[in-house]
Amino acid sequence: MTSNTEAFDYWIRNDFKQMNTALEELYFAREDRNDVTGLGDDIKTRLLEEGRSFIKTLLDEGNTDEGFDSQFDLLGNVGFYMAACRRHELTNPANEHKSPLVEASALAMQLGATLGMIPRFSSAHLETHNRADAGVYKSFTFLDDERIFINYNTRAVFAYIRAAEALLHTLPLGVSHSVTYDLLVAARDALRDVNRFNDELFDKLDTDRFFYCVRPYYKPHKVGLREYRGANAGDFAGINVIDLLLGLCRADDPYYSQLLVDKFLFMRPEDQLVLRDCMRRKSLLDSFLESLATGGETP
């Protein structure tokens, strides 16, 4: 990281979160919690201008080629800033021909094109690739319910990934291999972990706080001329690997293939490669059926 990148990252982890938290407390105390107008305008202006200043400095510096991980992290920080501006109605794609965040759009598009991803934050920035400093990772606010939401989403995502990796390891072995059974058990156990994490999230999350104070940061917004949907917790390859290898979905199904095409650029490049490879593989369900049809002894 350059010193300017580090300064922006420090701001995202501290002042940025403090300003968002202060605004959320103002909104939540209001009778109409959806109405964010006319509250905390001084905080909104500070957030807008401080973020713009950091980003303009990075644009002027022009040296964002610090390696993939550093670029990916910087894209997340720019994306967090743009998402917060959208949440606080400092931008609104319904009223704009293009994003008014000119500097942020320019930097996000430069980074997105270099990385092969959409030019906004993705779920990986908050989940699987969200580095903690002294135990504290990046988020939009300091609210407990955002922390709970990110914690359990991240746990569930990694459980899905464990299940997907176990299924992928069965492919070179074949369905009749004795160790394939062990891998299927590992996949089953990982999916049970997903259910457990979802149940715990349901029990612990304040749904009002989540709906009014966390969910709005995932709204669609424009980057340059184009509007991009918000990040989705399913924007990683593992969940689709499970669908495809278990035969629950098919890559040649028009509806499902459209879903895959739409999400590709929301995933990190290594996930894109895994999913592309999986789309051409025979499902385990088809392999089991073929083994039975040909008289396989232990499918």
Regions found by a protein language model. Name each.
Residues 1-299:
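Surface-exposed peri-terminal alpha-helical interaction modules
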